[in-house]
Each structure stands twice: as C-alpha cells, then as structure tokens.
Amino acid sequence: MRDSVNDDPGGEQAKITPPKTWAAGVPAVAHALQYSLAETSPRRTALNLLDINQTKGFDCPGCAWPDPAPGRRHTNEYCENGAKHANDDATTRRVTPEFFRRYSVSELARSSDRWLNQQGRLTQPMVKRPGADHYEPISWRDAIALLADELRAMDSPDEAVFYTSGRAGNEPAFVLQLFARALGTNNLPDCSNMCHESSGAALHETLGIGKGDVSLLDIHHADLVLTVGQNPGSNHPRMLSALEETKRGGGQIVAVNPLPEAGLMRFKNPQKPRGVIGRGTNIADQFLQIRLGGDLALFQALNLLLLEAEDAAPGTVLDRAFIEHRTTGFEEFADHLRATVSWPDVLAATGLTRRQIEELRDRVLASERIVVCWAMGLTQQKHGVPTIRELVNFQLLRGNIGRPGAGVCPVRGHSNVQGDRTMGIWEKMPQDFLDALEREFSFTPPARHGLDTVDSIRAMLEGRVRVFLGLAGNFVRAAPDSERTEEAMRRCRLTAHISTKLNRSHAVCGDTALILPTLGRSERDCQGGEEQFITVEDSMSQVHASAGRLEPASSHLLSEVAILSRLARQTLGDRVPVPWEDFEADYGNIRDRIARVVPGFENFNTRVRKPGGFALPNPVNEGVFPTPGGKARFTRNDFTMLRAPEGHLLLQTLRSHDQWNTVPYTTDDRYRGIHGSRRIVLVHPADLAALGLADGAKVDVVSVWQDGTERRAEDFRLVSYPTTAGCAAAYYPETNVLVPLDSVADTSNTPTSKGIVVRLEPRP
C-alpha cells in the first residue's frame, strides 16, 4: 500500500523544465488520448469523446464553460482535461468487495488521492460498521434503511448536513434540497461555498442577481476582455477558443494574475491549422503580474483614473445617462475614491508600476465594450467580496453592464455548480423560493438559515452534527484545514457518500459509513425500461439536457435520483405529500415540479428537449436590476492589503494542469515545467535569496494564524519560479492543511486559499 508521500516520488526526484509559453495544440490531444486509452478501451474512448458536449450527448463533468450554439459546435467539443475527466469516469477498472476485504479503512486513509482514484469505479453499496476497519457489502434496501433510521433518530433535523458537489445535475439537486427541507433543515452546504460564494454575494448586493450577465457572443464581440485571477489554459481550456474569437474580432485581452500561465500567453487551437502547424494566437496584449490580494487596489486605482479622465474631458469617459438612470450611490463612491486612494499604497499592494495601470486605463478608454472575467484568484481572498464589488463599480462607470459585448463573467469551475444553486442548494435560499416550495408541495419549509461548508465543519467539531450525506464530491479533501476537517468527519455518527469513484472522504468517515455507488454522466440511465436524462446549467445560464449511452459500470448502480428518492420515502413516509416514487420513475415529473417552483423554468420539459436547451432570463440584460431600490449599486470599498511579516511569504493554493478538482491524474504539471512530483513550492528567485534558501532545497511549509495552532505541510521542494515577488504557490489539496478553518472571506465565509501567510523551514 502506498501512502500519500510514497505515491509521489518526492520533490527531490522531480524534473524541472522551463514553463511553457503556450497552451493546447497537438500535445494536448496526445496527452488526452494517452490518458483515456490507459483508462478504458478504444471503443469506449471513442464513444465518450463523440458524445461530450453534443446536443444528444452528455455534459462534460468538468468545468461549467458554455457550449457553442447547435450548428457551431465541433465534432470534438471538449478540451484535454474534459477528455481525461470523462474517460476517467468511464474507466474499466473496478472497485469490488474483494478490494475492501484486502484494504482496511486505515490503509485507505493513508493513501494518496491519485492512488484512490486510480482503483476505478465503485460497483456496489458498502458499509463500515462501528468499530470495524473494513467496508463490507450491504444491499441497497439495507443501506437506505440504515441511513433513514439514523436520520429519524436525530433529536433535531439540524443534526444532519446534506452536501452537494457541482457534478450533480439539476434533478437530483432539486430532490435533495426538497428532502432536506421536508425533513426540516436548511443545512445544504455545497462546493460553491468554497469557490464562487464571494461572486454571488457581491453580485447580489450590486446587481440584484448572483450570476453573470454575458454570453459567449458577448466575449466574441468585446473590444476588451479582462481575465482576472484565473488560469483558463488548465481550468477552463475551452475558454481559450472564445478568447481567440475576441482576438479575431479585433478585441484586446488583459490578463491579471500572480503567475504567468501558459494559457494567458498563447493558444494553439488543435482544431485549426494555425494551431497545429502555426504559432497559434497570442492571448494577452498586456499581462499584469499582480501581488496576491492586490486586485482591489488595482480596480480602485483604475476607477480613480477614469474619474480623473472624466474631469479632464467631461462627458467623454463615463456613461452619465446610465449612471443617472440605472444606478445609485455614484457620488458617495466617487467621493470615497478621491479621498482614500493613495498611489504608494496601490503600488505596494499590487506590485505594479503606475505606468502599467495607466496603460490599462488607456486600453479601457479606447474600448466601447468590456467584459471582465474572474475565478478563484479573486473569490478566495479575504477581501474577495469588496474586490468584486469594485470590479462591478468599474463596469458601471462606462455602462458596461447589461448590453451586448460587455458585462461581468464569473467563470465557474464545476459543471453544474450554478444549476445546483438555482435548484435550491443553498443554506439561505430567499423566502420567495421557500414560499413556492410550500405552495407546490403543501409543507412549510424551515425559514432559519442553515450551515454552509465552513460552519458545517465547525458544527461537526462541536458535536452538533450526527449525519453527513454527500451528493458527489470529495468533501474531506476539498475543504480547508485538513486535520480539523478530518477530525470533524470522524466525530459524526454516520457519514454517507453518493459517489462514482473511491476518494479520501470514504476513508475519513464517521462511526458508521456508507458508500452509495451511482451512475456516471456518460452512462445510460434507465428507469422502468425508459431512458432518462438530467439537465445542467452552465456558467452563462444556459440549461440543457445530458444523457449518456455507455453501459453502467455495474448492474448494482443506482442513479442519484433513485438513491435520494428512496431515501426520502424511507425517511419521511407520508409526513409530506411528495410523490418520491414518481420522481424516480420519470425525471420529467421532477422537471414539471421545478417548472412551477423555479422562475425561468416554465414549460421545462418541452423547452429543454430542443437542441441546445434554453437560456434562463437575466433581468440585468433587460435593464432591470432586482435590488431593493431597483437600480444597480455603486459601493464604497475600503482599501486593504495582504501583508506578510519579514521572513514570510503569501501562499496561494492552486491546481496543476494534470488535475481536476481534488483528483490529480498524474504527478506532472507540464505547463509550469514540473514533472514527477506535486510536493513543490513555487517561489520567486529574489525571495529564495532573501530567505537564504536554495532552489531545490527541501522544506516544511508552516502557516501562521492568529489561533497559534501550527499547521504544517511536510517535505516539499522549493522551485525557483517567476511568480510575483513575496508570493508563493503550491498544489491543492495537498496544502489545504495550511488553510485555517477560521480564515475566511468577509461576507461569503469562503476559505482564503489565495493569501495564506507561511514560513519555509529547511528540513534536516
């Protein structure tokens, strides 16, 4: 059995090469096929790749980037990581009861994420009994009865937590939230709590809706696109095709990021001749290598420069009509900026020069239509919410909200994470949603807000949570403060996970633990002899169908909808008049109910069967801002700066290129020039010199937090790398152990994985 260190050859054996300056191209195709063919047969690989993101196929279980309209899609409408992810799920490897007889839970808990994932698909329900160290088979009937009995035995419904990952489709998400609320709790944390919660909080406050307002065509037709705090070449590779269209249309791109990522520099589109035999397309016209946490200061400085440009040439810079008729708070915002922005502070916080920021201003002034895209580089900051509010201020100044070729675009990193929220997966859904549930299902949902991810962990640590149910995902590895999260899970009486593959959350578990194996996206889902489909919502609010055609990995698998419907029926009986059996028999019955509960889903079953599905209405694009005052809101945001004491650095956690969420497919990160290890810390050469450390040295990484607790990631290799001075980077989830549970973003409660104060301790 290999543990998490031995499964990784170790930093001293890693091969380091210069970082790549372009993304995709023929190597991306080769790597995708190499990985896919190692997981499954050529036939299954071909079937899967021909079905991904097609109108009659299945939605890629990877990121939430939207698909082109029907008729504009390629035959191969996927990226390298999407192909890996889909065929990883379609693997021919199987985790059978014999595997669990061979390996104890203790051994599995010492295993690496990569090794666990490589074992293959789960094949039948398994249970770990109290005091046991092995899983054993259990029938579906007994597994659901065991979980239902534990739920019924709780003193309060709030002793249960129902977690959802963005892999879950709309129909199972709707059933899960309905079950939780019928039981009597709003404890519905999800993966969004750890990523784009800051986006939703900021956009709700300023625009009245927690989603972006752009489409693919808006990006294609923009004069200027800002990509801020994101690495599209690895995390949303198909976004590069959209940015290529921006460049072809004459638009410019400015990238703002602490690392000079390959996908921000140049893109070789493998579906076009110039991407195969040519140089490809240059992406960023300007690259601003910003200091961690400096984005708020950057947008404040940029907004001040626009105000000053308007002062110098009144009526030529700001959209005065838009500001007057569609917004509120402008004067207070402008006065605040003029009184508080200090250029020495801005330059210290950003690590940029004034000339660089003025160059960006000049590009803005030359552009009529501007789109701003961002990801977790913003949302996982301590001040992520005010940063995004300031970004919205920037767009409001020139009327770049709610019109063609312009807008705000939070780029979400998991297939249906936005759809899950639309379906009600949130611990604090608005009252009008709860009222709609009550009208439709004749029970009164609880009004008191529930627990998000961080608060769920706190409650588990305090003994206030008895049962944890995870719908997809890998909660233990996705969450911050790994040691405390693991302790929290082990304090539960029962933990259960609806999963396709083995992961660490199955090994770090409660007294009793259930593994409930389910269908993958690419597999056929038949109920009563009738083929079913689920639906998903992408990052740009397009809702479409998803149906697989591969044979299920095991005859013992149940769909997510079937598992949840049976559990709800067994737990609740006739306490609420919900037809759970009908939901399992035909998912169209769920969609009929969604159509009557969720605005924008009217006539759901008919509309979603059209090729490409339908777009949800976005009031912002109609000039309507559903804020309390009916207008978009300028906000005042106080300057703040992340600081590290002398001898310390600011650390960000990030994915490698060869990784999807918590699953590393290999120990390589080839775009960054890292081969053969993930136990790596990227550090600027000037910082290495200042700290008296050598490139290649072995260190422990220790985070510094106000609670005085030592959080340590051991045995990492230093790699001299062109990151921003004063800032370092290391891979997630291995360094989640360094992120304190109580270090969260203001307002959103999102873990601050982009700005951890650390010191590097040389190893003997």
Language-model region placement:
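Short Cys/His-rich Zn2+-coordinating modules
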Residues: L37-L47
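Short, flexible, mixed-charge glycine/proline-rich loop motifs
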Residues: N48-Q54
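Long, structured ligand/cofactor-binding scaffold of large enzymes
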Residues: P61, Y135-L224
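Low-complexity, highly charged intrinsically disordered N-terminal segments
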Residues: D88-H134, I144
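Non-catalytic alpha/beta scaffold blocks inside enzyme catalytic domains
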Residues: N117, M126, E197-P404, P410-R593, ...
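Long, low-complexity segments enriched in small/aliphatic residues
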Residues: E581-R670
